[in-house]
């Protein structure tokens, strides 16, 4: 396991906030962080992912720089799809008020059956991202790569 994976939390969250073409569904930073900690225990700061690759951080464009950056791109795209669901429309206006229900048992994440359609979709976006992060190495050379030059 790669202890730096917890750092993905902030990058993904900032990426969602900074991308103008991605609607913002329910996003509970603490909840997503706990999901990451369930699968990838770590006590490191999120700052190393604030400017990682082309998608882990504010905005997102171009070709992902590596597997980890593809995880961030996929997560961004998943949230964009959530924004198209009729069930998510009401949630989009109050993105921080609702959280989904999930469980973490022996480092296994499960989105619970009591979620409504939108919460279930978002929970599965986050779950898939965390699983992706857990299998993707952190490449120091993709930190602060200069998105203007490398992410076209």
Curated annotation (Swiss-Prot):
Disulfide bonds join 38-104, 54-151, 56-72, 71-132, 78-125, 88-118, 111-123. PROSITE patterns: PA2_ASP, PA2_HIS. GO terms for cellular component: extracellular region. Expressed by the venom gland. Residues 20-27 form a propeptide. Ca(2+) binds at residues 55, 57, 59, 76. Its main location: secreted. Transmembrane segments: none annotated. InterPro entries: PLipase_A2 (IPR001211), PLipase_A2_Asp_AS (IPR033112), PLipase_A2_dom (IPR016090), PLipase_A2_dom_sf (IPR036444), PLipase_A2_His_AS (IPR033113). Belongs to the phospholipase A2 family. Group I subfamily. D49 sub-subfamily. This is Acidic phospholipase A2 S17-58. The lineage of its organism: Eukaryota, Metazoa, Chordata, Craniata, Vertebrata.
